[in-house]
């Protein structure tokens, strides 16, 4: 391993010990914000520090085995130990390279998940509902919280559009590769001839940004409309204009929120989604510039990004970005998404490593 990388790892090890000392300091414990920030940093440094210690141990094993090679009686055993230690060292070196990749500061944030029905009419809305259920199930397994911000229901079930906030550890980093177009092939319940229909929905995943970090939005750039919430009827339908529609005139971005009975709460929710969308649009421009130089596995949430096809007759799901096909569609729709998410995360990391080696 390069001496410059070893030096960086030694510095991170020192910082890990320093942060641990801070966490035992009474003044730090009393400052909840600082304590949380340092706890997060400590957790992030723990993996790389542990891996570095194991790598150093493997180097010691290599050195000890090489010294035993001169002993005729011990040579055979030493050669076997050397082989094992070198293989372990190489494996740990690869792990360390991944752990040292630049971190996206947004990865630890909560996110807004937006699902919109695309082509396919009622079937597209039903599929959007199935997708939301899939992500909700996945969130349950990760112990994340799901809060619906806004929903427009389809006439025969599902959603024309739904926006939810998902909160928990590392939410955005885990879900950010879901942005893009998702296509379904199946026989709709209303199809009497048994023909397979193709419909689609688009998914956008945006980091939920704290209010202090949101882009400044000029009030003069906003058009705010109020209207009566739509619903299925009954006692919970609003009789006042509590629903909010906010249009950001410079970008044309429109956000509606009618989930709360309070107009004030709906407006606050809509503004947080609007801020996230404006920031996401700015990030998208940067991503597109980078994608012109190398492939970009991070989708933009645009329907032209063809992420996956879910083929129900064959029980097959295909991720077109990395040519991955699994015949485990039932499990995927029940929220077992790690089998799809982890391969693309690994591919993304491989691309990052490739980019870094080109710079070197």
UniProtKB/Swiss-Prot annotation:
<dbReference type="InterPro" id="IPR005139">
    <property type="entry name" value="PCRF"/>
</dbReference>
<comment type="function">
    <text>Peptide chain release factor 1 directs the termination of translation in response to the peptide chain termination codons UAG and UAA.</text>
</comment>
<protein>
    <recommendedName>
        <fullName>Peptide chain release factor 1</fullName>
    </recommendedName>
</protein>
<dbReference type="GO" id="GO:0005737">
    <property type="term" value="C:cytoplasm"/>
</dbReference>
<dbReference type="InterPro" id="IPR045853">
    <property type="entry name" value="Pep_chain_release_fac_I_sf"/>
</dbReference>
<keyword id="KW-0963">Cytoplasm</keyword>
<dbReference type="Pfam" id="PF03462">
    <property type="entry name" value="PCRF"/>
</dbReference>
<dbReference type="GO" id="GO:0016149">
    <property type="term" value="F:translation release factor activity, codon specific"/>
</dbReference>
<dbReference type="Pfam" id="PF00472">
    <property type="entry name" value="RF-1"/>
</dbReference>
<feature type="modified residue" description="N5-methylglutamine">
    <location>
        <position position="235"/>
    </location>
</feature>
<dbReference type="InterPro" id="IPR000352">
    <property type="entry name" value="Pep_chain_release_fac_I"/>
</dbReference>
<keyword id="KW-0488">Methylation</keyword>
<dbReference type="InterPro" id="IPR004373">
    <property type="entry name" value="RF-1"/>
</dbReference>
<feature type="region of interest" description="Disordered">
    <location>
        <begin position="291"/>
        <end position="312"/>
    </location>
</feature>
<keyword id="KW-0648">Protein biosynthesis</keyword>
<dbReference type="InterPro" id="IPR050057">
    <property type="entry name" value="Prokaryotic/Mito_RF"/>
</dbReference>
<comment type="similarity">
    <text>Belongs to the prokaryotic/mitochondrial release factor family.</text>
</comment>
<feature type="compositionally biased region" description="Basic and acidic residues">
    <location>
        <begin position="291"/>
        <end position="308"/>
    </location>
</feature>
């Amino acid at each position: 391993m390069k001496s410059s990388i070893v030096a960086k790892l030694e510095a991170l090890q020192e910082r890990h010990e320093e942060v641990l000392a801070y966490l035992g300091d009474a003044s730090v414990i009393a400052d909840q914000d600082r304590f949380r920030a340092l706890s997060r940093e400590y957790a992030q440094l723990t993996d790389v520090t542990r891996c570095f210690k194991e790598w150093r141990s493997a180097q010691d094993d290599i050195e000890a085995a090489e010294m035993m090679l001169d002993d005729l009686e011990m040579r055979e055993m030493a050669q076997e130990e050397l082989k094992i230690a070198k293989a372990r060292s190489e494996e740990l070196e690869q792990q360390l390279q991944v752990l040292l990749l630049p971190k996206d500061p947004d990865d630890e944030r909560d996110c807004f998940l937006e699902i919109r029905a695309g082509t396919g009419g009622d079937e597209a809305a039903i599929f959007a509902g199935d997708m939301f259920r899939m992500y909700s199930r996945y969130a349950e397994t990760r112990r994340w919280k799901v809060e619906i911000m806004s929903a427009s229901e389809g006439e025969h079930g599902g959603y024309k559009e739904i926006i939810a906030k998902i909160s928990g550890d590392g939410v955005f980093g885990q879900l950010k590769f879901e942005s893009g177009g998702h296509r379904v092939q199946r026989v709709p319940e209303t199809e009497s001839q048994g023909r397979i229909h193709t419909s689609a929905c688009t998914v956008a995943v945006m980091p939920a940004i704290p209010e202090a970090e949101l882009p400044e939005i000029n009030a003069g750039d906003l058009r705010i409309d109020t209207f009566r919430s739509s619903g299925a009827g009954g006692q919970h339908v609003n009789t006042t204009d509590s629903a909010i529609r906010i249009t950001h005139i410079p970008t044309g971005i429109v956000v509606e929120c009618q989930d709360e009975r309070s107009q004030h709460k709906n407006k606050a929710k809509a503004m947080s989604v609007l801020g996230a969308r404006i920031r996401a649009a700015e990030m998208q421009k940067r991503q597109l510039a980078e994608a012109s130089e190398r492939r970009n596995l991070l989708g933009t949430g645009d329907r032209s990004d063809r992420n996956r096809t879910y083929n129900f007759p064959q029980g097959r799901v295909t991720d077109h970005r990395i040519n991955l096909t699994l015949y485990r569609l039932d499990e995927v729709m029940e929220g077992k998404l790690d089998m799809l998410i982890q391969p693309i995360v690994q591919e993304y990391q491989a691309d990052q490593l490739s980019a870094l080696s080109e710079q070197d």
